[in-house]
């Protein structure tokens, strides 16, 4: 069973485990990092290149996460939330119609954007009836409610890339 929205999904940022960050106080300041004071015979200046490289790596990682997060920012969050609620409702209703859990459900594809592209309510209803042809329970109420819920929704188009 799948519910297709037509939009891309934001990739979750994963942190590279084991990366260490060293903090360095300004030269002439008091107190070094715990890391530099734990090495015998090393000074703050000795650990400065390590701190700079580690900090640069962290900044790069944050920039990567920020770039990945831009995908959801370009979509209207309110529309995404409405779409997610609708998809969860569809999965719940299909579970009731087919009388089984999501994992056991036959492969039913309801493409919300495809429904929104349809020219009329009749065409949308027809597409839904085709998708639910294997359902043994009455689907009219589900179709009516789904059409009511998508009324006024906008199609999620892929985000436009900004030209640099």
Swiss-Prot record:
It is found in: Endomembrane system. GO terms for cellular component: cytoplasm; endomembrane system; membrane. Residues 1-19 have a biased composition (Gly residues). Its main location: membrane. The modification Phosphothreonine is found at residue 72. SUPFAM superfamilies: Myosin phosphatase inhibitor 17kDa protein, CPI-17. The keyword Ubl conjugation does not apply. Residues 50-62 have a biased composition (Low complexity). Has over 600-fold higher inhibitory activity when phosphorylated, creating a molecular switch for regulating the phosphorylation status of PPP1CA substrates and smooth muscle contraction. The main inhibitory site appears to be Thr-72. It comes from the Eukaryota. The modification N-acetylserine is found at residue 2. It is a peripheral membrane protein. Belongs to the PP1 inhibitor family. PANTHER family: PROTEIN PHOSPHATASE 1 INHIBITOR POTENTIATED BY PROTEIN KINASE C (PTHR16188), PROTEIN PHOSPHATASE 1 REGULATORY SUBUNIT 14C (PTHR16188:SF6). Inhibitor of the PP1 regulatory subunit PPP1CA. This is Protein phosphatase 1 regulatory subunit 14C. It comes from Rattus norvegicus (Rat).
